[in-house]
């Protein structure tokens, strides 16, 4: 599914960053195998750093970057540690599909806010917590359609948009808007949908100047 939603995410990220990543410093927090990181690097950002704590994922990411020639750098470091080392360094901070897997999402959001420059953009994505998301993201994706390995998600870790907005506000960020990502099992296609944040959704925040 990541390969399918990547172009949609990238389009939205570039849009939120003002229409271009050219000359911007970008960090991809919880980058995994670097699918999005690499796309961000190829989209013209000045520097693109992917950070994660999973050795295996970073190995895949580095290898792929070597093969593709994408100017992305990768590092094994916790987002909180990176924020302590490079506060206010990044124009765009991206954290996709990570918050529902960490023990303390509020801490991760605070660190993302700290990484952003004043006036910078912080873009987060996660899964809504409601009966529909349980049906689609767990029963559908993990058991019926087998898009993901069983046990990938814990429903109680899903985050409602209002909860995400509250944590971001407490971290000093201003909400710019939400964007849903919907999946059609018949056409097997994802699309951006601002009117449906029922399952997968992204949120855009600005750090005040």
Segments (PLM) and residue ranges:
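Conserved SAM/SAH-binding beta-strand->alpha-helix loop
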Residues: 54-56
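Conserved class I S-adenosyl-L-methionine
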Residues: 123-145
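A short acidic, Gly/Pro-enriched loop at the edge of an enzyme's catalytic core
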Residues: 83-92
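Conserved SAM-binding loop of SAM-dependent methyltransferases across substrates and taxa
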Residues: 33-44
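Conserved SAM-binding strand-loop segment of SAM-dependent methyltransferases
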Residues: 67-81
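Acceptor-substrate binding/catalytic loop of class I
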Residues: 146-163
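Conserved alpha-helix/loop element of class I SAM-dependent methyltransferases that forms part
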Residues: 3-24, 39
